[in-house]
Regions:
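C-terminal non-catalytic regions of proteins with extracellular/luminal or membrane-system context
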Residues: 1-510
């Protein structure tokens, strides 16, 4: 086998771009960001010194050659001046309060102890042009978030830090180095000028964040979750956390599908939302409509003063019919190229009608276990988020089956699930209906469909290439392999192979 060396510089460049373009700008009052050349910046928060590159669990046990944190990257930015006095205060405190690594799998703290803010630190906030507050969170496999302080919610020390810095600073920017959304009620309380979700950007994450903060990259990330005012506003909260069963009462009304249908007023930031350093104008129309797909044309114009990219999002409003549906469903999206001020681009998004179909698990449409398009008017919307997307056109459909399937794992216990009913005024009422319970035995069906057992033949000298050349069948090739070897190929060396990172499942041959 020829030696192959990865072009790490190329991959690092791509990772840096992904980290930057994934950052989501939620607030940017009076264009606080990007940071301007020559501005002095006071960096607050111990997580400036300890960047979360990833979450926990198997996905977090990744060996990287290096990790660039946010502070590491900011120190390389010659355009701004960092307050070295404040950094020294934090560095001395961290010596006495080292990073808590936790106690191994499933026992790593969601957040780190934060330094109590002092008057000396607040003087730094007063004397600099910008105060940058960095908050960090981690979570992951075997260690989901909870509603405790320091997980979904800020700790008292973190909230006090944001509160007091916002009170005295000319401009406060909060950067969230997190793997998922957290409670955001503090934004309305303390009104920081800018809020940036930086997520966990991998080994080049710090560079990506710094590129956005300094304007080398125009903010263009969008929320993949909507952010509600309170954790209790999410309908899944009621039944979360049962280790034995899950009553999926919200049914298809998950995330933005619930809030856009029933609770728009409880949303702080809608699905798909994200600000830019420039502005865009979009015009959309249905370009083509065939039996199985539609093509939506969206013209995006950069109406601002800096170069930037926009994410075009396409949604559909389908008939309520007999099944009930959310007010809008995401069916397509695309990102533009980087557009100069005054430049425009036409983006064409092809959408399969399969993605607009509804699943009938009860047979109420006359087509049980089918994806169907119900009869009625379908309206397409396009824009920069679910809330602001505007109509691109409407068309009619007759009732038709898109795909015939079979019942698999329907619920085994009766309960009531959520359903939307359209009122005369165009709003939606949340009602409930009995969930269809299981009528087929999936275990029995699998047993009936099991292939015949191959009789072990021993080594016949057949190679896999012989199968490719159609000299023998795959069954004849596999029949040569012993049961023990087949098991080893299927499960590898388990979770404890010395040849790979501990915890890696199904390692095979290192």
């Amino acid at each position: 086998m020829n030696d192959y060396k990865l072009d790490l510089e190329k991959y690092a460049t791509l990772a840096r771009q992904a980290a930057a373009e994934g950052c989501v700008l939620l607030e940017n009052e009076k264009q606080a960001l990007p940071l301007r050349e020559g501005e002095s910046v006071a960096v607050f928060g111990r997580m400036a010194f300890h960047y979360y590159k990833s979450g926990l669990g198997s996905g977090g046990l990744v060996n990287t050659r290096y990790v660039v944190g946010i502070l590491d990257a900011l120190k390389e930015c010659k355009e701004i001046q960092l307050d070295e006095k404040l950094l020294g205060i934090y560095a001395n405190w961290i010596k006495e309060n080292p990073y808590d690594e936790g106690q191994g799998w499933g026992r790593v703290p969601w957040s780190q102890k934060e330094m109590e803010v002092t008057e000396e630190m607040l003087d730094c906030a007063r004397s600099n042009d910008v105060s940058l507050v960095i908050i960090g969170r981690t979570a992951g496999e075997d260690q989901d978030n909870n509603t405790n302080l320091g997980s979904y919610c800020l700790t008292e020390t973190e909230e006090d830090l944001i509160c007091r810095v916002c009170e005295v600073s000319k401009c406060t920017v909060v950067v969230l180095n997190v793997g998922n959304i957290i409670d955001m009620s503090w934004v309305e309380k303390y009104h920081p000028q800018a809020v940036l979700y930086a997520w966990q950007g991998g080994q080049e994450g710090g560079n990506g964040v710094a590129d956005v903060l300094t304007g080398k990259v125009c903010a263009c990330g969008k929320l993949t979750d909507r952010i509600a005012a309170d954790i209790k506003d999410y309908p899944s909260t009621e039944n979360f956390g049962d280790p034995f069963k899950n009553y999926y009462k919200e049914d298809i009304y998950v995330g933005y599908r619930y809030f856009e249908t029933f609770a728009k007023d409880k949303v702080l930031y809608p699905f798909g939302y994200g600000l830019s350093y420039t502005t865009f104008e979009t015009r959309a129309e249905i370009l083509k409509n065939t039996g199985d797909e539609i093509t939506v044309s969206v013209t995006v114009s950069n109406t601002g003063e800096v170069r930037g990219k926009e994410v075009v999002q396409v949604y559909v409003k389908v008939p309520q019919g007999k099944l009930g549906n959310p007010a809008r469903k995401l069916i397509g999206f695309a990102k533009t190229k980087e557009l100069a001020p005054g430049e425009q681009e036409e983006v064409c998004i092809v959408i399969q009608k399969y993605d607009m179909a509804s699943y009938d698990d009860s047979g109420v449409t006359g087509h049980k276990s089918c994806y169907v398009l119900e009869e009625g008017t379908y309206e397409i919307f396009a824009g920069s988020d679910v809330r602001s997307a505007k109509s691109a056109g409407i068309y009619e459909e007759e009732l038709r089956v898109i795909e015939q399937l079979q019942e698999a794992y329907a619920p085994i216990e009766k309960f009531r699930r959520m359903k939307a009913v359209l009122r005369a005024d165009g709003t939606y009422q949340a009602v409930t209906e009995e969930v269809p319970v299981r009528t087929a035995d999936p275990h029995k069906r699998r047993e009936e469909r099991m292939p015949k057992t191959l009789e072990y033949t021993g080594d016949k000298g057949y190679k896999l290439a012989d199968v490719l050349d159609k000299k023998v069948s795959m069954d004849e090739f596999v029949a040569q392999i012993s049961e023990a070897d087949l098991i080893a190929m299927f499960r590898g060396e388990g979770m404890c192979s010395p040849k790979v990172t501990a915890g890696t499942a199904a390692a095979f041959g290192g």
